[in-house]
Amino acid sequence: MTRINIDRLTEIEETQAILSLYYDARSYIEDFDWCVSTKKCWYDQGFGIYQKIGIFLFEIEPLNENVDDFIWVIVGDLPSVYLDKSILTGQEALEKYCELMQEWIDNVKNGASLDDCYPIPADPTIENAELLSSRIAFIRRELLMKDDE
C-alpha cells in the first residue's frame, strides 16, 4: 500500500490540466494548413489558470517561408486564438487576446460588421458577447491587473 500524498496529487492534477490545455493548443494550431507540425512548446505559467486558460508559444514547421516559425496560442474555456511572433511575452499575448475579443464584443453589441474582427466560433449574439465580456473582464482584473477599459 502507498500513502496518498494530497499535496503531490494536486501537482499531478495541475500537470494533467496543463497537458490537456497543451493538447488542445497543439491540435488547434496543427489544424491550420500553414502548420506542417509543431516542434517545441513553452507554457506561460504566470498567466495560465488551472483548467481554464493556457498561453503557449509553439515553434512550428511552417508550410513556407511566408509563415512565422513561432506562434502564440491561447486556449481554454474561451475562444482559441493564435498570434504571430511579433508578440514577445505571454502577458503581451494575453493583452492582445483581450483586445481582439473586445473588438468582437463591441461590434456584436453595436450591430457592426464582424468582417474585420478575429473570427470567433460563436454565434454573434448579445448573450455570447456578454459571456465573453465577463471572461475578458476577469482576465484583465485578475491576470493583467487592469480595470475594464
Regions found by a protein language model. Give the residues of each.
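Short, charged/polar micro-motifs that form catalytic or ligand-binding hotspots
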Residues: 11-15, 80-88
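A composition-driven signal for long, intrinsically disordered, charge-rich low-complexity tracts
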Residues: 37-46, 52, 72, 91, ...
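Acidic, proline/glycine-rich low-complexity IDRs
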Residues: 2-3, 15, 106-149
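An exposed acidic His-Trp-rich patch
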Residues: 83-123
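Short aromatic-glycine-(Arg/Gly/Cys) micro-motifs in beta-strand/loop hairpins
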Residues: 47-82
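N-terminal "first-domain core" detector
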Residues: 1-48
